[in-house]
Amino acid sequence: MNPIRKEILNFYIKLNNWYTNSWLCKFLLRNKDYLYQEMLRRKFCQAENVIFDSDIVTHDAHCISIGQGSHLHHHVIITAWRNHHTGINDANIVIEEGADIGEYTHITAMGHMHIGKNLLTGRWVTITDNGHGDTSLIELQKAPINRVLSSKGNVTIGDNVWIGDKATILPGVTIGDGAVIAANSVVTKDVPAYSVVGGNPVRVIKQLKTI
């Protein structure tokens, strides 16, 4: 082995041994979960008493509030995006208390998104108020990644809503209190309160309660 490389390797081994046995390493290992939780909480506008599982992805989390007692499971993505025309991020995502957001769920907004109390989602759910570009010929001639991201309408979800695995909530819709969204559904229009909906696009399967 090259003498210089050997010297570098020996130095690295000594440094690694020192760090592994140091008080700093032991402290970080003992407190890694607490430090991870605190790091994420400080990113958000509000996130007191929220449980974050591993590998949470955020963007501009200062525009996002998460209510007390909520739980974001592994690999949840939650992002707020700036207005590409003004350069200002005036997005506002509010998730009320008691939300339980399933693994790999993606919540994203450029405008205002309000999610009521006690939301329950399955895995791989998408909730979005935006899309890449529009359907004009000029935009369609661009690569999708180069089309300007724009909000298509605010999303509002009421209290005690249950959204099944792999459902997609598209821009501009309101979902009423107590609604149940079946797995694999695509929500393109408003959903009545206390109804069960499913399909692509969704239709009302059952009305559970008359308002």
Predicted segments with their positions:
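Domain-scale signature associated with acetyltransferase and cell-envelope carbohydrate enzymes
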Residues: M1-D129, N154, G158-N160, I169, ...
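Short, flexible, mixed-charge acidic loops at enzyme active sites
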Residues: G133-A143
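A short acidic, glycine-rich active-site loop
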Residues: A143-V155
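A generic "structured core" feature
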Residues: W162, V180-A182, V186
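Conserved coupling/switch loop of ABC ATPases
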Residues: P171, K189
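Active-site/ligand-binding-proximal alpha/beta "capping" segment
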Residues: T174
